[in-house]
UniProtKB/Swiss-Prot annotation:
Start-end of Acidic residues biased regions: 194-213
Organism, scientific name: Haloarcula marismortui (strain ATCC 43049 / DSM 3752 / JCM 8966 / VKM B-1809)
Keyword tRNA processing attached: no
Lineage, broadest ranks: Archaea, Methanobacteriati, Methanobacteriota, Stenosarchaea group, Halobacteria
GO CC terms in record: ribonucleoprotein complex; ribosome
Gene responsible for this protein: rps3ae
Ribonucleoprotein recorded as keyword: yes
SMART domains found in the cross-reference section: Ribosomal_S3Ae
Family affiliation: Belongs to the eukaryotic ribosomal protein eS1 family.
Name by which UniProt lists this protein: Small ribosomal subunit protein eS1
Keywords from the UniProt entry: Ribonucleoprotein, Ribosomal protein
GO molecular function: structural constituent of ribosome
Biological process terms in GO annotation: translation
InterPro entries: Ribosomal_eS1, Ribosomal_eS1_arc, Ribosomal_eS1_CS
Residues covered by region (Disordered): 189-213
Amino acid sequence: MSERSVSKRTEQKRWYTVQAPEQFDREVLGKTPAEEPDKVLGRTIETTLGELTNDASENNTKLTFKINEVASDSAYTEFIRHELTRDYLRSLVRRGSSKVEAYITVLTTDDYRVQIQPVAVTTKKADASQEKAIRRTMIDLVRETAEDHTFEQLIDSVVEGRLSSAIYGEAKDIYPLRRVEIKKTTLEARPEEVAAEEETAVDVDEEDVDVEA
């Protein structure tokens, strides 16, 4: 392809300003080019919490958003993932300490399915029963939080550190803790996707029922 053809195609593309969701104050995430608005939909963009808040101490928190709406020259996004950097997570663990993790899938009050991965780091080596008790506390608190939070409220609780602080407050009585963090949060399914899965499950169950003549 000639340089002129490439240049012409580039000129035909339109630039869209990508914005964070309203809960992140519609902060500008960047710009993305496309020939048609539909080609912008589904694109993802990663940033850090520090870039959104102008606080360098938050640069260890990565946020990923997905474009789900385009209007005029603006591309709007939804939150799909929160994750702490590997370097930061490694810095939490000291020799002779224990790292306790859990993987919890929850449903918010507005029917978003989310997986949350908390991690607790102890000051010294904990035994198996103590690790189990800490993990149980993490699971219970994450589930309780999801049961009375909308998706937006739950993400705010994670990103702002309230959920990890609540876990720390409960679990530190089991064994001294150095730190509790939410390692990763992932949007697994939206309400319409959850409803479709439930409908499919019901259809399958009905097909499995034996009807006696």
